[in-house]
């Protein structure tokens, strides 16, 4: 079928499919599209194919459908089928990349171990760091890809001769938080065609392109955690990690008993099953003692945090006086002004200008307004030094 953009598709010029490789026309450019089986990546593949690019679809098989992973999850059999169906209908090749073993080792096992350490992990970032932007990019090069395109809602621009990431234009769909660990070398190979579009417009494009997945709901869960039931996944995959322990107040009083620290996250208020004259929150998870520490909201808020494995886009040396940044501590949270100083070897200290909830295992992602600077993993310095 011949693709002719309608006025609705142009969206006042925001649909920008300029040559993905400078100086190389579409018909000579091979684009490997990371297809999850969802609407966004399917639209990317369809638009590039109809624009004349040599498109190859690639879908990662990350897990089998099982009680632990769930049948309704991303990168499972249903999603692979949907991606193959889109590729077959449009007429471009599609490959399935079996990363089940490495995904279990580097993402699921890390997820389990993170909870055992009393952290709150972000497996989607770990997946980006490993199977998606390490292994998949390697496979894309091996099959002759010039670039890899994804359905992420971020913008890729060149600033002062360096490739940079800007937040997606749609603030409700911006995914820059999850890409803080992308390296400068990987970014040279990546393309994000949807960064200037709103999700509603992408849905409209899918309908106008008659894609079979046009009405497919967005995935809301961690791909191997169906219906956000991560506790069930932990019980199935590592039963020994779920054991009873004490709930204590920050002042040392014993308040009750818990059925596993993996059932709690820092900042949690509901589900503590203890009575008190004022609201109590999870302030800290002491994995060494298998103890949940709770207290008033004032004990929860912090002005400083510590990060490790810092990644910068592009590579950057923090001035000795520190660097003023906008810091985001949650994927859906607002940014706060902060200053980061280097502690050497990829470690840093971030001082916030506002009180915030700080959860070890989450990411502290750094921005200069719209521009993604990089980020690192929040860690408990006392536990780290005592390890």
UniProtKB/Swiss-Prot annotation:
Cellular compartments annotated: Cytoplasm
CDD domains tied to this protein: MnmA_TRMU-like
InterPro entries, sorted: MnmA-like, MnmA-like_C, MnmA-like_central, MnmA-like_central_sf, Rossmann-like_a/b/a_fold
Record flagged with keyword Disulfide bond: yes
Region annotated Interaction with tRNA, chain positions: 173-175
Gene3D superfamilies the record matches: Adenine nucleotide alpha hydrolases-like domains (2.30.30.280), HUPs (3.40.50.620), Translation factors (2.40.30.10)
Protein's UniProt name: tRNA-specific 2-thiouridylase MnmA
Originating species: Anaplasma marginale (strain St. Maries)
